[in-house]
Amino acid sequence: MRICVILLLSFIFTETRLQVSNERFNTLLSSYVDSAGNVNYKGIIDNPFALNDYLKFIKEISPKSHPSYFDTNNSIKAYWINVYNAIILKLMIDNPGENILDIGYVGHDVFLKKFKIGGEKLSPLYIENKILRKMNDPRIHFAINCASKSCPPLGNRILVEENLDFQLNEKAILFINNPENVFIDYKENVIYLNRIFKWFKKDFGDLKIYIFKYLKNHNYDEVKDFKIKFFKYDWSKNSTNE
C-alpha cells in the first residue's frame, strides 16, 4: 500500500512539474517572441530562468525515460518539437552572434551539439532526423526553428497535445502562404520554394501537391506543369532589434 502511494505521489509530482515547466516556457515565448517569430535574445539572456527551468526538467524527463507521462502520439510529438526549439534557444543565448552558423563549431556541425534529455545526450540533428521525422508528419518542419530568417518562425506559444493538429496546420498555412517561402511566377512559369522543401523532399512527396494542400488563392491546374526552383536560404539571425 505504501509503495502504491509513493508511486502515485511521484507520478503526480512529475506531471505537475511538466505542466509548470511548460507554462513557464510558454510565458517566455509569449514575452520574447513577436508575432512574426522574431526573438528578443537579449531579453532571454537577461531573464533566463524560465528557459533554464525547462531545460533542467527535460534533462530528467522524456517520452523514452518516462513513457507513462506521454501516452499519445501527439503528446510525444509536441514534447520533441518544444525540446528542439528550447535547445536552439539555449545555443543562441549561450553563443551570441550574427547567426547560428557563427557559433563555435564548424558550419552545420552546431546542430550536432548534444544536450542531456531524459538521461540521454541528444543533438538537435538527432531529434529532427531520428525522432521527429520518423513520425511521418511533414508539418513538423514548419514547427521547429533553427534561429534563422528563412526557417519557419518560432511561435510565441508552445505546442500542446490537445491542440497539436490545429497548431501544426496553422503553421503550415502560415509558412506556405508567405511569398518568401512559396512564390508563383506566372510570367516565367516557375514556382519558387523555400529550400527546406528541397532538403526534406522525401518527407513532403510531390511538392506541388503538398503545398496546394495549404496554399490559398491559386489554382493547382494552372501551375501543375511549372518548374520548381528554390530560394537561397537566409541563415541570418531571427532577432528583433535588440
Task: Please give the residue ranges for each predicted region.
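Interaction/scaffold regions that mediate signaling and macromolecular assembly across diverse proteins
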Residues: L18-E242
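Sec-dependent N-terminal signal peptides
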Residues: I3-T14
